Amino acid sequence: MNFKKLPKIELHCHLDGSLRVDTILDIAKKDNIPLPSYNKKELINYVSIMDDCNSLDEYLNKFFIPNKVMQTKENLKRIAFELLEDVAADNVKYIEVRFAPLLHVEKGLNIEEIIESVLEGIKEAEKLYDIKGNLILGCMRNMDIPSAFEVVKKGAKFIGKGVVAIDLCAGEEPHFPGKYIEVLKLAKEYGYRITIHAGEAGVGENVLEAINLLNAERIGHGIYIKDCAEAYKLVKEKNIPLEMCPTSNLHTKASESYEAHPFMDFLKDGIKVTINTDNMTVSNTTITKELEMLNKFCGLSIEDYKILYLNAVEASFASSETKEVLKSYVKEITA
């Protein structure tokens, strides 16, 4: 089965985890940014999981270097453009890029300038390629609560202009949703859609709380609902889409192997599963690679993929017009 030629949708892709290594090197040289190595083969080890990784926290260390080159308008625009260029080459028709604006203020940019720069890169790529992109703003759980309010408030002016949703990301502690009730309440009032990283690092109950306390419409990862019957039941009853990222889950030790990953069990049981990359560079993956691995190790069929694709269309925060266009590509999903 040629997965490369199939139309695809990406709902969970971090901008700072999906840079070209050549671009990191190019910007570092241009802007005099120190790197541990200026040799591409050596640098890859600092930004990608090449062999083993023991935890989500270790995985997140791979973002340190990419963020060093994402501190100017020009660089942010370029990196956003290149991400859409890369996924368009993988026949991705629609992507929701997510990033945390406050990771990009080191050289004095304000939140509005940061968001504008990324949106400019997305829009420039849309003009050149058969792809549509939207932006999800991330609030970092390892920063204070006022910082989350700041992102929500300052990003609101871009809703309807490319920004579609708010997210909570970074390391996952038990019962984190309780801290963010007022933040997400405000986000909902502004008109943001809501997706929350939860159930990625061993705490299925966080998914339950993300839905009940934060009004999450989608869940990033959600793999650990397999160990929380109440969360599983709620996700199924409310038809909450899961943005699953199998290779990333292997890297963070949320799953031992592709075969052991619960996505197929969830899919067969009617859970609205979608397949995503999480971080193309950190996990050294593409949507095509994800599908090839799931086909090889889990028996993913073309009919399964049709369901996954339509799940992603429905789960997306795209406009109704864009969704209709995306649905029209279903006829191209053939073995």
Curated annotation (Swiss-Prot):
<dbReference type="GO" id="GO:0046936">
    <property type="term" value="F:2'-deoxyadenosine deaminase activity"/>
</dbReference>
<dbReference type="GO" id="GO:0009117">
    <property type="term" value="P:nucleotide metabolic process"/>
</dbReference>
<dbReference type="GO" id="GO:0009168">
    <property type="term" value="P:purine ribonucleoside monophosphate biosynthetic process"/>
</dbReference>
<dbReference type="InterPro" id="IPR028893">
    <property type="entry name" value="A_deaminase"/>
</dbReference>
<feature type="binding site">
    <location>
        <position position="16"/>
    </location>
    <ligand>
        <name>substrate</name>
    </ligand>
</feature>
<keyword id="KW-0378">Hydrolase</keyword>
<feature type="binding site">
    <location>
        <position position="197"/>
    </location>
    <ligand>
        <name>Zn(2+)</name>
    </ligand>
</feature>
<comment type="similarity">
    <text>Belongs to the metallo-dependent hydrolases superfamily. Adenosine and AMP deaminases family. Adenosine deaminase subfamily.</text>
</comment>
<dbReference type="Pfam" id="PF00962">
    <property type="entry name" value="A_deaminase"/>
</dbReference>
<dbReference type="GO" id="GO:0004000">
    <property type="term" value="F:adenosine deaminase activity"/>
</dbReference>
<dbReference type="InterPro" id="IPR001365">
    <property type="entry name" value="A_deaminase_dom"/>
</dbReference>
<dbReference type="InterPro" id="IPR032466">
    <property type="entry name" value="Metal_Hydrolase"/>
</dbReference>
<dbReference type="InterPro" id="IPR006330">
    <property type="entry name" value="Ado/ade_deaminase"/>
</dbReference>
<protein>
    <recommendedName>
        <fullName>Adenosine deaminase</fullName>
        <ecNumber>3.5.4.4</ecNumber>
    </recommendedName>
</protein>
<comment type="function">
    <text>Catalyzes the hydrolytic deamination of adenosine and 2-deoxyadenosine.</text>
</comment>
<feature type="binding site">
    <location>
        <position position="12"/>
    </location>
    <ligand>
        <name>Zn(2+)</name>
    </ligand>
</feature>
<feature type="active site" description="Proton donor">
    <location>
        <position position="200"/>
    </location>
</feature>
<keyword id="KW-0546">Nucleotide metabolism</keyword>
<keyword id="KW-0479">Metal-binding</keyword>
<dbReference type="GO" id="GO:0046103">
    <property type="term" value="P:inosine biosynthetic process"/>
</dbReference>
<dbReference type="GO" id="GO:0005829">
    <property type="term" value="C:cytosol"/>
</dbReference>
<dbReference type="GO" id="GO:0043103">
    <property type="term" value="P:hypoxanthine salvage"/>
</dbReference>
<feature type="binding site">
    <location>
        <position position="14"/>
    </location>
    <ligand>
        <name>substrate</name>
    </ligand>
</feature>
<dbReference type="GO" id="GO:0008270">
    <property type="term" value="F:zinc ion binding"/>
</dbReference>
<keyword id="KW-0862">Zinc</keyword>
<feature type="binding site">
    <location>
        <position position="278"/>
    </location>
    <ligand>
        <name>Zn(2+)</name>
    </ligand>
</feature>
<feature type="binding site">
    <location>
        <position position="14"/>
    </location>
    <ligand>
        <name>Zn(2+)</name>
    </ligand>
</feature>
<dbReference type="GO" id="GO:0006154">
    <property type="term" value="P:adenosine catabolic process"/>
</dbReference>
<feature type="site" description="Important for catalytic activity">
    <location>
        <position position="221"/>
    </location>
</feature>
